[in-house]
Curated annotation (Swiss-Prot):
This is E3 ubiquitin-protein ligase RNF170. E3 ubiquitin-protein ligase that plays an essential role in stimulus-induced inositol 1,4,5-trisphosphate receptor type 1 (ITPR1) ubiquitination and degradation via the endoplasmic reticulum-associated degradation (ERAD) pathway. Also involved in ITPR1 turnover in resting cells. Selectively inhibits the TLR3-triggered innate immune response by promoting the 'Lys-48'-linked polyubiquitination and degradation of TLR3. Keywords: Endoplasmic reticulum, Membrane, Metal-binding, Transferase, Transmembrane, Transmembrane helix, Ubl conjugation pathway, Zinc, Zinc-finger. Its main location: endoplasmic reticulum. The gene is Rnf170. Pathway: Protein modification; protein ubiquitination. It catalyses: S-ubiquitinyl-[E2 ubiquitin-conjugating enzyme]-L-cysteine + [acceptor protein]-L-lysine = [E2 ubiquitin-conjugating enzyme]-L-cysteine + N(6)-ubiquitinyl-[acceptor protein]-L-lysine. One of its GO terms (molecular function) is zinc ion binding. Disruption phenotype: RNF170 deletion mice show increased expression of type I IFNs and proinflammatory cytokines (IL6 and TNF) in peritoneal macrophages. The mRNA levels of type I IFNs and proinflammatory cytokines in the heart and brain are also significantly higher. The chain crosses the membrane at residues 53-73, 230-250, 252-272.
């Protein structure tokens, strides 16, 4: 006695019997058609023809790309925030009254980069942790003359400024430059150790990583132990990216398997920025 497989869908069963005949629909053949029918019934994706894994990967990639573009392009905006315009106006008037004596030629560090406070070419520029550039004397005056209870907010984006990074070199040893370095160190000593949220650390990534990698590949920059730690982090991220052993293996989850790779690399970049901030803090205590 022959045993036959029965479809749950009677229409599919009638079509198979009519085309092949019931004698041909034996167990191996029926098993194959049954599995194909079940796979078609279970293939219910959000968009027909595109798997849900691909959709999730595309959405996550677009979100990360949008965040990165926002972090990179926000520095293009150089207009003073409306809440800070009054303080900046007072500072500009004070700078104009102090310019009775001709000022020395300004040293150029950034091509066509102007300070948003004094509206002149940036002189001995200082960069905030949010990535905006100002004259060193302008941002210090903005801090001194403002009624701040703690760290200042950026005159442009209103983000809390917890770190000032000098962009000019150490060749100039004039009295004004020495006083400016002391003021910058004083500010960093007060506010660089403030607790930071995870979102604030992410927003600081482009600026801190740029300064960290610049010092890694410069002579007399960071000490060798910190350089070795950065190299180990980069090597660990590279080997994890090419390793077949993953928390979310690509063989099982397809494109979604790459998300954990990018997440690990992202965490390592945040760790490098935290280390660099600690190095700057240690310099202030020497």
């Amino acid at each position: 006695m022959q045993r036959y497989w029965r479809f749950q869908d009677n229409k599919i069963q009638d079509i198979c019997f009519g085309v092949l005949g019931e004698s041909w629909i034996q167990r191996p053949v029926m098993a194959r058609y049954y599995s194909e029918g079940q796979s078609l019934q279970q293939d219910d994706s959000f968009i027909e023809g595109v798997s849900d894994q691909v959709l999730v990967a595309v959405v996550v990639s677009l979100a990360l790309t949008a965040t990165l573009l926002y972090a990179l392009l926000r520095n293009v905006q150089q207009n003073i925030h409306p809440e800070n315009q009054e303080l900046v106006r007072v500072l500009r008037e004070q700078f104009q009254t102090e310019q009775d004596v001709p000022a020395p030629a300004r040293q150029q560090f950034y091509t066509e980069m102007y300070c948003p406070i004094c509206l002149h070419q940036a002189s001995f520029p200082v960069e905030t942790n949010c990535g905006h550039l100002f004259c060193g004397s302008c941002i210090i005056a903005y801090w001194r003359y403002g009624s701040w209870l703690g760290a200042i907010s950026c005159p442009i984006c209103r983000q809390t400024v917890t770190l000032l990074l000098t962009v000019f070199g150490e060749d100039d040893q004039s009295q004004d430059v020495i006083r400016l370095r002391q003021d910058v160190n004083d500010y960093n000593r007060r506010f660089s150790g403030q607790p930071r949220s995870i979102m604030e650390r992410i927003m600081d990534l482009p600026t801190l990583l740029r300064h960290a990698f610049r010092e890694v590949f410069s002579v007399g920059g960071l000490f060798w132990m910190f350089r070795i730690r950065i190299m180990l982090c980069l090597m660990g991220a590279f080997f994890y990216l090419i390793s077949p052993l993953d928390f979310v293996p690509e063989a099982l989850f397809g494109i979604l398997g790459f998300l954990d790779d990018f997440f690990v690399i992202f965490l390592l970049l945040i760790y490098i920025s935290i280390m660099y901030r600690e190095v700057i803090t240690q310099r202030l205590t020497r």
